[in-house]
Curated annotation (Swiss-Prot):
NCBIfam families: frr. One of its GO terms (biological process) is translational termination. This is Ribosome-recycling factor. Belongs to the RRF family. The keyword Manganese does not apply. It comes from Kosmotoga olearia (strain ATCC BAA-1733 / DSM 21960 / TBF 19.5.1). InterPro entries: Ribosome_recyc_fac (IPR002661), Ribosome_recyc_fac_dom (IPR023584), RRF_sf (IPR036191). Keywords: Cytoplasm, Protein biosynthesis.
Length: 185
């Protein structure tokens, strides 16, 4: 039973880490990345559709994304969806492709993004600690109901703390990686 609780805790902590990693991938950093467009939906004949299902998205060498729709009539729809997304980018429609230029961010913008990244990582750490709290509560209930001995509970707490430390450290690593990505130019 103890192992099942640990396994459940690890699974939930891993999901929290993956969610934070995904949030970081959608964050704007000043560097062109197709991932920034993944959440944007375009009205495709009445159906909200992700841009990457309507076009190819390439990173060009001049700090821009090139969006080449498979149907030319989608250019204006893609342009409108990007403008509505509040990414802070202005799409340029040249009749064949939509181009998104990524200007070099100011130091102030980068510091703001680092602060936002830190908040996201902190949110992830809080989620991991909440998982620890919930699982520990279950284990203490088991000990109270004589399903687990006091010694088993103590060992369980130590193992759970190691697991928690591992995933909190993982959140810190994700943040440091994102911070480095934001600040490097």
């Amino acid at each position: 039973m103890k192992n099942m609780l640990l396994k459940d805790a690890e699974e939930r902590m891993k999901k929290s880490t993956e969610k934070i990693s995904e949030e970081f991938s959608h964050m704007r950093t000043g560097r062109p990345s197709p991932a920034i467009l993944e959440e944007i939906k375009v009205d495709y004949y009445g159906v909200p559709t992700p841009i990457n299902q309507l076009a190819t998205i390439n990173v060009s060498e001049d700090r821009s994304l090139i969006i080449r729709p498979w149907e030319k009539n989608m250019l204006s729809h893609i342009e409108k969806a990007i403008l509505a997304s509040n990414l802070g980018l202005t799409p340029i429609n040249d009749g064949n492709v939509v181009r998104l230029n990524f200007p070099i961010p100011t130091t102030e913008q980068r510091e703001k993004w680092v602060k936002l990244s830190k908040e996201i990582a902190e949110k992830g750490k809080i989620a991991v600690r909440n998982i620890r709290r919930d699982v520990l509560k279950e284990a203490k209930e088991m000990e109270k109901n004589k399903e687990m001995t006091e010694d088993d509970l103590r060992r369980f707490e130590e193992e759970l703390q190691k697991l928690t430390d591992k995933y909190v450290e993982e959140m810190d690593k994700l943040f440091e990686k994102k911070k480095k990505e934001i600040m490097e130019f």
